Amino acid sequence: MRDAYVESLNELSQDMMQLAQIVETTIANTWTALESLDNKLASEIYHGNEDINTRVRECMKKDLTISLMQTPVATDWRHLMATQKILYDIERITDNCADICHYIFHLNKEGGPVTPPTGLQEMYQVMASMVVDVLRLYNEGGIDDIDLIRDKDDIVDMAFTKSMEEISEKMVKEPNHVRQYISYVLIVKYIERMADHASNITDWILYRSNNMLK
């Protein structure tokens, strides 16, 4: 019975590592699509999101099965509980990638391109590094760099505020391009949300470690 329990935990761990790789690739490809306004790549990401959600739900099901059927010890229970919550944030992160791709379609549909907000690439890269770092910490079982990840979330928040101000000014100066700038408002908001979800994952990593920061 114990062997089956350990095997189930190992299988879930392998699934989570594979999911992390898929998430990292999706985030990287989403930026490529956004930077180049590549409708084809955006469509692949948008329509492929359901496959990622299916993987997430499969991991959730395995996690719940272990929690309910295998009688985990206290340490493992905290790990399983944290994994369930982390999976929700992972699903939302990839949903936001699909959301961004949806607005790439809008940017292309509304006519000629407009200049994206200053610092958009840097904002996206900081967010992407947060996701990569938290998934690495989850899979490696550590809590190093938690404070650094949270500091990055503050950087994304500041970039979000600055971008909103810049887009508002451009809407006034270029009223013919308001629809495109609205798309950028939503894109920037999704990036900010992705960083928030990454920050949420740090809380559950700390919960799992039973070493919450004061």
Please place each PLM-identified region on the residue numbering.
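Cytosolic, long alpha-helical scaffolding segments
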Residues: M1-K214
